[in-house]
C-alpha cells in the first residue's frame, strides 16, 4: 500500500497478535511520517489493548530501525511497550540499521525470530534492497510492441497502447521514483511522463539530451515536478531542472545509474525507444 509514497524508505507492514488474535495493524504510509510499527502499536492502544503487549507477538516485514532519522527508532518503541516477541521477515541492509535493530531488541530481552517469509519480503522491497546491496537503482524497461514486433517508426509517433494499457503504465509510473526517456522519444512523442491517469505521485522526469537540443516548449520540461537532463554541455540547476554532465567516452548507462544513486533515486522506469532500451540490455 505504500508503493510510490514512502521511497526512499522501504515499504513495511506490521501486525500485533495476542493469543492468536490480531490486536493492531499498521504500515508505513508516507515518507517522513510514522513507520509501520508505530502505526500498529498506536492502533492497538486506541483499541484498548495496551495491557496485552507483554504477552503479544509483533510480525513485521523488515527489521525495526535502531537510529534517529525522520522519526525515532522503532526498536526503542517496541522495547518501551514491552512487546514479548518480534518476528521479522528480512534484515534491513541500510548501514544505519543492518542488524542493529535486532541486536537492540535481543539485548532488551525480547525474543527475535528472523527470516520468516524472507523471499516474499525481499521481493516486496526489491527496489530498496537493490539500491543498498548493489549500489544502484532498480531498473525496469518498458515498451509496447505491435503483433509483428515493431515498437516504433523513425521520427514519427506510433500509437500502439490502448486506454487500458495507458492506465496500467501510469500505475507503474506511480510506483517508481523516476522515469527515463531519450532525445528521440522526447521529440517524436512529446510525452508528459506523469501519472494523470492514475492516483499517486508523478515520478522525477529524466531525459538524455547530450547536445541540449531539445526545445524548452516540450511537455517534459513543464514546471510541475523535478527534471534531470543528462548532457555533455553543462552542470547545474535552473528552476526545476537539474543539468547533469556526462561524458561520451564511458557508458552513458553506468553514468546515469551512478548519478541516480547520488540523487538517492532507488528505482527508474525506462520508457525510451529501441536505442535507450538496448543500451540497458547491453
State where each predicted segment sits.
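Amphipathic coiled-coil/heptad-repeat helices and related helical stalk/stem segments
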Residues: 37, 70-74, 98, 162-165, ...
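Short beta-strand scaffold segments in enzyme catalytic cores
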Residues: 12-20, 143-144
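Acidic, glycine-enriched active-site microenvironments
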Residues: 8-12, 56-57
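Active-site ligand-binding patch in enzyme domains
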Residues: 130-267, 275-278
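Short, structured interface segments
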Residues: 115-132
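Short, basic/aromatic recognition patches
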Residues: 1-7, 131
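Zn2+-dependent cytidine deaminase-like catalytic core
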Residues: 16-120, 204, 279-281
Amino acid at each position: 500500500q505504500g508503493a510510490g509514497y514512502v521511497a526512499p524508505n522501504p515499504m513495511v507492514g506490521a501486525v500485533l497478535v495476542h493469543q492468536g488474535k490480531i490486536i493492531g495493524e499498521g504500515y508505513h504510509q508516507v515518507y517522513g511520517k510514522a513507520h509501520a510499527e508505530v502505526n500498529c502499536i498506536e492502533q492497538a492502544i486506541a483499541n484498548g489493548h495496551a495491557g496485552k503487549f507483554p504477552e503479544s507477538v509483533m510480525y513485521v516485514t523488515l527489521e525495526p530501525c535502531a537510529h534517529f532519522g525522520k522519526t525515532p527508532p522503532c526498536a526503542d518503541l517496541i522495547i518501551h511497550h514491552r512487546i514479548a516477541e518480534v518476528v521479522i521477515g528480512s534484515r534491513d541492509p541500510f548501514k544505519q540499521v543492518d542488524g542493529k535493530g535486532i541486536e537492540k531488541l535481543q539485548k532488551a530481552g525480547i525474543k527475535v525470530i528472523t527470516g520468516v517469509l524472507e523471499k516474499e519480503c525481499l521481493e516486496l522491497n526489491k527496489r530498496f534492497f537493490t539500491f543498498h546491496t548493489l549500489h544502484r537503482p532498480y531498473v525496469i524497461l518498458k515498451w509496447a510492441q505491435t503483433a509483428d514486433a515493431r515498437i516504433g517508426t523513425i521520427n514519427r509517433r506510433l500509437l500502439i497502447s490502448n486506454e487500458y494499457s495507458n492506465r496500467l503504465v501510469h500505475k507503474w509510473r506511480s510506483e517508481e521514483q523516476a522515469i527515463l526517456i531519450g532525445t528521440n522519444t522526447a521529440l517524436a512523442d512529446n510525452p508528459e511522463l506523469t501519472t494523470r491517469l492514475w492516483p499517486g505521485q508523478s515520478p522525477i522526469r529524466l531525459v538524455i539530451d547530450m547536445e541540449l537540443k531539445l526545445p524548452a516548449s516540450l511537455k517534459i520540461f513543464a514546471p510541475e515536478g523535478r527534471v534531470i537532463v543528462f548532457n555533455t554541455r553543462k552542470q547545474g540547476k535552473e528552476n526545476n531542472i537539474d543539468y547533469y554532465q556526462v561524458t561520451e567516452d564511458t557508458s552513458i548507462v553506468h553514468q546515469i545509474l551512478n548519478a541516480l544513486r547520488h540523487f538517492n533515486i532507488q528505482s527508474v522506469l525506462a520508457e525510451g525507444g529501441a536505442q535507450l532500451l538496448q543500451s540497458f540490455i547491453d
